[in-house]
Amino acid sequence: MIATGGVITGLAALKRQDSTRSQYHLSAQSPGPAPEKKTTKRKPRADVVVVRGKIRLYSASGFFLVLGVLILMAGIAMAVLGYWPHKDQPKAPETKMSANNTQSFGREQAGSIAQFLEQHMHSEKMKMLGPFTMGIGIFIFICANAILHENRDRETKVIHMRDMYSTVIDIHSLRIKEQKCTNGACMGPYGGDTEIRTFGLDSQFASRLAANTLMSFSGLDGDVRFSHRTSSADDDDGLMSEARGGFCLLSPTYKDRSECIFGFQDDGRWEDRRGALKKCQTRSIVSSSISAFTLPVIKLNNCVIDEPDIDSITEDLEQSRVHSRPPSMESLTVPVPDIAKAFKPPGVQLLRSNSATESASSTSSRSSLSPGSTSGRFLSPGAARKDFGSNNSIHMLSAHSKSLDLERGPTKLTVQPEQRKHPSWPRLDRSNSKGYTRLENKEDPMDRLIVPPVDVKKDYTKKEKLLMISRSHNNLSFEHDEFMSSGLKRGTSETRF
């Protein structure tokens, strides 16, 4: 079958050659621009190059091919001797005797070959063995021919595979070079987009929200505030602008992540490296606030912070905004804790809006600088790690995140006594969080620590408000130092789920 297939392919090739020759003769006979037609017809044949292996006759299959041909020739000769036609029959006996004498004389002269031919001429053995020998020769010839063509096809396959491998390797090397060139040209020194793939959508939104929170607490850009946005496009633009404003506050590792997520780089990157001292002062606050931002609602060390009434704060909101100035990182001071004035029966209040947070931060900064307030000291890196640790930043971020989740404007808010007792209810009720259970009638360990609230006067002067805010910060720092001295771990917190 393989031999017949090879013969059929050869016949098809001959037919193609005949068709091309006939077309060539017709084009030569037809008048017109003959050379142009010749060139146009020869070009596609020159482009198509059929690569095939060689038929190697100097091999075992070639030897058997020759052997089969020889056996076939011997069988043909034997069949010819057996089926050689007979002569005319003798006419008379006299002539027959004379003919026998002449034949005997010719036999002596002819020799052994003539004797062999005369003996096996018209013999039954030759008639039988001749075709049989021919069949054996033909069988050996066909098998050897098939083996020769199989070897040639194997060589052609090897050649094609080598060509394919070489082309694939060349294409792969060219692609690698192109990718290197494109990565070096487009990505530049920050090469690659692997960090973008590693961070998902949740980490992107969390980092954006963390950048916005840092902007609100840093005060470097006083005009940046959280506002209610209706469209998603305006929300993305606002987040990008706020992240660019607070980009200088991030530590180096988070700055690289924010570069990958937001898609921009800091313009004054090299200038910020020169001011490493200022970064050293703010790095502890930023790192602790970012690490604590992804935590749920947190209650700090089982203590309640004493804060003024939210109704009295919201009444003087516009006046505090007029007189407040954006605080800088150099003006941040840590009040020295006063043990005599530290403890006060706490009245639990919640900051419900970003405006209340801004007014509280501005009044606290002014109280630290005013002569009537408690004595303070400038912020150093060690003090930042100690006083502005994870506890304070977590409290600030939790209060601020509540204002973000509630999405309330700078309006007057009232706090129910049940909500004062359980500060995590509004966030868990209004957010789409799953897995949280409300502790309604169960015994709360905070109830044991909370002293019955004292009636607070509604009419406070500005000095009294400032004193109350400063006492709340003194209360927090005093309890923090007390826990540190007792051997507890830093940043211990109780998470309510």
Curated annotation (Swiss-Prot):
Glycan-carrying positions: 100
GO cellular component terms, semicolon-separated: membrane
Source organism superkingdom: Eukaryota
Membrane topology recorded in Swiss-Prot or TrEMBL: Multi-pass membrane protein
InterPro entries linked: DUF2371_TMEM200
Membrane-spanning intervals of the chain: 62-82, 128-148
Entry keyword set: Glycoprotein, Membrane, Transmembrane, Transmembrane helix
Compartments it resides in: Membrane
Positions on the Cytoplasmic side per record topology: 1-61, 149-497
Composition bias type Basic and acidic residues, residue spans: 427-438
One protein family per Pfam: DUF2371
Biased composition (Polar residues): 20-30
Low complexity bias (residue ranges): 353-375
Record topology, Extracellular segments: 83-127
The family this protein is said to belong to: Belongs to the TMEM200 family.
Protein name from the UniProt record: Transmembrane protein 200A
Organism of this sequence: Danio rerio (Zebrafish)
